[in-house]
Regions:
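Terminal targeting segments of Actinobacterial cell-envelope proteins
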Residues: 1-5
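Active-site-adjacent structural segments surrounding the nucleophilic cysteine of cysteine proteases
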Residues: 7-13, 20-150, 191-193, 198-202, ...
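Structural recognition of the beta-strand scaffold that forms the well-ordered cores
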Residues: 81-83, 165-166, 185-189, 219, ...
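Extracytoplasmic/secreted envelope proteins and their assembly/folding machinery
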Residues: 83-91, 100, 104, 150-158, ...
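A mature extracytoplasmic/lumenal domain signature
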Residues: 86, 168-170, 189-193, 222-224, ...
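Mid-length scaffold segments of soluble, non-membrane domains
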Residues: 134-172, 177-180
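Noncatalytic regulatory segments and standalone regulatory/sensor domains
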Residues: 158, 180, 201-212, 219-266
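Short, solvent-exposed, low-complexity loop/linker segments
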Residues: 176-195
Length: 266
């Protein structure tokens, strides 16, 4: 059952919201198409502090230039359903309650195994921009399962009554602006929260797909412009984490700043 309640969000500060852009497909010299290539900056690594988390909501707190949304601190149910868990949190912030398994069940699936190339990496596999790729109970390093990118998650959010907007190229300023408005944000990065150079496989339809081991999606729930930090729920472990804005911005580059915003329609 989906339960709707009036949202309760506190926020302080004002940032400029940049317009969303659609994910392009590039035509390569050999006539094939590709999702965008990502260029990574060189930035220092940062220690990631953790706090214990339960299924109870976090406390909404504000200070000058800071926002922390009321969000449940939950853990993903399955090995690779971080995107569904992240959306569950994002919807809950908007007071739209949808079970994690229901979100995952609504996603299009491509369970076909990959074609492994000569270096032991997938040369062909499904397109996570269209489907959940692989077995949700699989293991990424063995390429038995992978995940899903933002377009199907946008569709799922809209299915449950939210307004969702997804694109690549998210910046920290855009994230903070959305949080200031009380909107939820989900960002794609890797589970070690560090920048990586993505690899590419070719989808069944010939489109090149960027990928990285440890693909992960997290709901961002707060920021502090004085401490220069970003706070999010790590649904892999069910904890709240805080990174420096510099470290978070670097981690986002692995998937080209991929993310979605989610807001209520009431």
């Amino acid at each position: 059952m989906i339960r709707l309640r009036r949202p309760a969000v506190a926020a302080i500060g004002l940032l400029t919201l940049a317009a969303a852009v659609a994910l392009p497909l590039w035509t390569l010299a050999d006539g094939t198409t590709s999702h965008p290539t990502v260029t990574l900056p060189t930035l220092p690594t940062t220690t990631v502090p953790t706090t214990s988390g339960t299924v109870s909501p976090s406390t909404a707190a504000t200070d000058n230039g800071a926002v922390l949304l009321k969000a449940p601190i939950i853990k993903q149910d399955l090995a690779l359903d971080c995107e569904s868990a992240a959306l569950q949190v994002a919807l809950a912030v908007q007071n739209i309650d949808v079970p994690q398994d229901q979100i995952y069940a609504s996603l299009p699936q491509d369970a076909r195994p990959p074609v492994i190339g000569s270096y032991g990496y997938p040369s062909k596999w499904g397109d996570p921009f269209k489907d959940f790729v692989g077995d949700v109970n699989g293991y990424e390093p063995s390429f038995t399962g992978y995940g899903v990118y933002y377009p199907p998650i946008v569709t799922a959010a809209e299915r449950y009554g939210a307004i969702a907007n997804g694109h690549t190229g998210w910046s920290v300023a855009q994230i903070e602006s959305q949080l200031h408005l009380g909107n939820s944000v989900v960002i794609w990065l890797t589970s070690d929260f560090k920048p990586h150079v993505p690899q590419y496989w070719t989808a069944w339809d010939g489109v090149r797909v960027p990928w990285a081991i440890g693909e992960h999606a997290v709901p961002v729930i707060g920021y502090d412009t004085i401490k220069d930090t970003i706070t999010f729920v790590d649904v892999l472990y069910g904890v709240e984490r805080t990174l420096s804005t510099e470290a978070f911005a670097a981690a986002m580059t692995t998937f080209g700043g991929m993310g979605i915003s989610v807001s209520a329609t009431f």
